[in-house]
Every structure is written in structure tokens, then in C-alpha cells.
Amino acid sequence: MGNIMEEVKLEEVAEISSGLVLNRFSSDQEKEGEEYLYITLKSVEDNKINLELLECMNMERKVQERYILHKGDIIMKLAPPFSAALIDFDLPNLIAPSNFAIIRIKKDFDAEYLSFILNGKLIRRQLNRLVEGTILTIIKISYLNELKIKQRDKKEQIKYAKLLSLFLKRRELKKRILKLEEQLMNNILSNL
């Protein structure tokens, strides 16, 4: 029989806030302002952020520190499919818009592990129950605070995070191989 793990609410292990409402800070592109990069909905997939899909914006005033993303933060889409991703890089002036939640670890939890958990089926089921029957399937920060996750030993979390990360890398490599084989096949066929 497996050991019984204590469940904790997400708000107990992380500080959760909404991203920045961009149009309150934006300026005309011709005007001088501080330049910021922001995460787009399409840039978040499979627990990763595609840096090529980030957008750039000039801000007429300085953005508060709480909106600036740092290595170790997690962002989560507030609309389906509710994808989460770990910020595993350093990039100055990176912000998340208001259609994302910013999740910062405040307790004995591994950020990478938590990002995988947030993308898991158990969390998806909890989120789907919370938005059931509503016309707009946008989750509120208060919903995220109530999500229940299993408390594990931090060493165990790190082991699971490494394992899951390896699976993701392996899947990504397989996708690349398939793409290269497709290109190779097309090159051969075009020369026949």
C-alpha cells in the first residue's frame, strides 16, 4: 500500500498574482519608453516558453517589480488549456500579461516539479470543475489558490522533475528527428 500524502492548497506553497494589464502601460512605438518583452499565449506549450514567440513593447512608465518575471517563476494561462511553464532562463524586462497568472514559490517546493504538477491531469480536472457551467472559461486567481496538490519531500520532487524533464527533452528530440526525416524524404522525392 502506498504512503498517504498530505494535500496542501497551492496558496500555501506559492504566491499567485495576475499578470500586467498591458494597455495601461503601453506607449506609442515612436515614443521613447522602456522596452519590455512579454509572453504570448502561443509561446507557452509543453511546460516550455518559446522565446522566438515573445513580443516586444515600449512602456511609458516603469513596470512594478512584482510583474517582472525571474528564473524560477511559473506562469499559467488563465484560459483553456491552462498551460503552465517554468521560467528557466534569465531575461531582463520580461513580463506576463493579464491573461496569465504569475506563480512564485514561497515554501519548500521545487518550481520545476510544481510546473509539471500544474500541467497534470489532476489539476486540469480540478480547474474544469471550477469553471463548469460558466460561460467564460477563464480561471480566477482565487481558483488557483484553492487547487490541491500533494505534499512530497523536496528531494523526491527534484527527482520527479528531472525525470519528467528528460521525458520532455526526449519527446522534443523525437519530434525533431521526424521533421528532419520528412525533409530528407521530400528532398529525395524532389530529386527523383
Label each residue range with its predicted role:
Residues M1-N23, S27-D28, K150-L192:
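Non-catalytic DNA-recognition/assembly elements of restriction-modification systems
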Residues E11-S26, K42-K71:
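Sequence-specific dsDNA recognition surfaces
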Residues D28-Y36, E55, Y67-L69, L86-S98:
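Short, surface-exposed loop/turn microsegments at beta-strand edges and helix-strand junctions
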Residues A111-G133:
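Glycine- and charge-enriched low-complexity intrinsically disordered segments
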Residues V63-Q64, D90, T134:
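A structural connector/turn signal
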